[in-house]
């Protein structure tokens, strides 16, 4: 979604929200939470508030009138009824005949509500320096996580990684072969964005940054001499990230055409730009996802930018055997989340031994 459209949608949701949700939004914007995250949270709050009114748990005529007392006095049974509603309601805006939302979507909804309740009961201060209320019913609501062993997850992910020589082969394919299959009209569009697209893919493969971190990069955040970029991690922490040397040429080629190709002026701070009707804009997450999916599907298998992050992490662990180093590269505070890469690498080693 383009940034301008995203901000428009956010304003639409803000216009119907209670005052305390607007306080929450302002507080999290200062962290900073990304606009994408806040947009998703606002959608979840609307879903929840709509249900409160439909279930007669509040007698007000519109969402903006739902008061703090309503949230304070909701019971565990009320929230469990909401979860059951989510699990059984028909999916909207889809051709699927499947009843109910996925567990992943339900967990996302509950996560958004937990964040709001934590803000209202712990983080915010009223005139007396106290939170708005103390009872956090969300602490009593359990979430169900998908059960899957690390070995099983590693096996599923491994097929979607560009390991070994495939990392550079993927870049080389986009650079030299992809164009050959295109019509003359499609070639024109491809050539316009070729350097930018290659720079994005190379950066993801060479640094392992999250999609949101790549989207939010500004020119000042990129140091090609040191091959270091500055990013805002989850939770608003600023971090310096090393970038593998193979990405340097692609990034330099993009920078050489960025100003002329995308009509960038001094006020256009975003590193990765797109141009629409002569106006440069920051490239958004959905456009990058589609771009990565398009090229990767033609090369081998359709993947997301997050799989390129997994690719970097797996290759780095394979080269160093250090979970601590991989955790630091990815911006994780613990090595627990990097256990996945040990399973992938160990499986690769076993396959290599079997072929001896």
UniProtKB/Swiss-Prot annotation:
Any matching Pfam family: Phage_integrase
Annotated catalytic residues: 210, 234, 306, 309, 332, 341 (o-(3'-phospho-dna)-tyrosine intermediate)
Q: Where is the signal peptide?
A: none
Q: According to the UniProt entry, how is activity regulated? A: FtsK is required for recombination.
Gene Ontology process terms (BP) = cell division; chromosome segregation; DNA recombination
- GO cellular component labels: cytoplasm
Alphabetically, the GO molecular function entries are: DNA binding; tyrosine-based site-specific recombinase activity
User: To which protein family does this belong?
Assistant: Belongs to the 'phage' integrase family. XerS subfamily.
Q: What is this protein called in UniProt?
A: Tyrosine recombinase XerS
